[in-house]
């Protein structure tokens, strides 16, 4: 009995040279004919049968990798026909999925084995900050900010009427909620891209972004501590 399957994943990914080499080693062992395609941000496409040409790709800032495809066959045949195996590693910001693979023309036992192994490789590509790119995280962040705003206003406005308090909270929540809903996702996507290809010179690019991320968070917490200590000092001396 011959079967086939198609699976997709939508989590954030970090495609590193190490994980790509590991995946390629498995595919090259199981299949006899392997070919690669690399899609670039400017629209160009590269076709090769040598994985090293992808690993050594010198990608300038405006020509970053957006997708890598690996196609393979059990026996040599024309790749214009549907291959026995294909996997796409895509930039989630430009695609409806980050990983998609299809397996065809294999037995039931082979299908179970391949699905288990490719699922494992796919999870290896999942970024450590994948949760930060989920819609649920954005929603929770906005709600938390709105709760903090409501508490802050309640603390400052103990003497105003309930109606005035409710209308003030509602107006500020709507305005700030709208701003957060727009700015938070954009800021997080900038700091934590939905998909990255740490291959070639892009490795250094994302290392620099990681350092920038750390500096931003250190600066944020230092500013927060200074603000708290300043508030305590003002309250102490104003007594």
Each model region followed by its residue ranges:
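Amphipathic alpha-helical surface "interface" segments used
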Residues: 43-45, 136-145
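Membrane-protein extramembrane domains
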Residues: 14-132
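Hydrophobic transmembrane alpha-helix bundles
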Residues: 72-80, 162-176
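Hydrophobic, helix-forming membrane-interacting segments
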Residues: 140-150, 154, 167-189, 207-239
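N-terminal pre-first-transmembrane soluble regions of secretory-pathway and organelle membrane proteins
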Residues: 1-41, 195-205, 209, 213, ...
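Membrane-proximal, non-transmembrane alpha-helical segments
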Residues: 89-139, 154-166, 170, 181-200
């Amino acid at each position: 009995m011959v079967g086939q399957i198609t699976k997709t994943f939508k989590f954030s990914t970090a495609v590193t040279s190490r994980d790509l080499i590991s995946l390629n080693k498995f595919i090259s062992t199981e299949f006899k004919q392997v070919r690669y395609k690399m899609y670039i941000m400017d629209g160009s496409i590269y076709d090769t049968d040598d994985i090293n040409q992808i690993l050594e790709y010198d990608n300038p800032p405006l020509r970053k990798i957006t997708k890598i495809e690996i196609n393979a066959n059990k026996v040599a045949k024309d790749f214009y026909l549907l291959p026995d195996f294909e996997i796409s590693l895509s930039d989630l910001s430009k695609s409806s999925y980050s990983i998609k693979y299809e397996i065809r023309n294999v037995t039931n036992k082979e299908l179970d084995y391949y699905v288990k192994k490719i699922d494992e490789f796919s999870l290896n590509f999942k970024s450590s900050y994948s949760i930060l790119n989920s819609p649920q995280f954005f929603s929770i962040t906005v709600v938390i900010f709105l709760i903090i705003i409501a508490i802050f206003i309640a603390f400052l406005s103990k003497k105003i009427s309930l109606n005035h308090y409710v209308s003030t909270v509602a107006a500020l929540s709507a305005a700030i909620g709208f701003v957060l809903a727009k700015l938070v996702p954009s800021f997080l996507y900038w700091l934590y891209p939905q998909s990255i290809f740490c291959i070639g010179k892009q490795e250094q690019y994302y290392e620099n972004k990681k350092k920038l991320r750390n500096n931003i968070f250190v600066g944020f917490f230092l500013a927060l501590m200074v603000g708290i200590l300043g508030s305590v000092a003002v309250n102490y001396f104003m007594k």
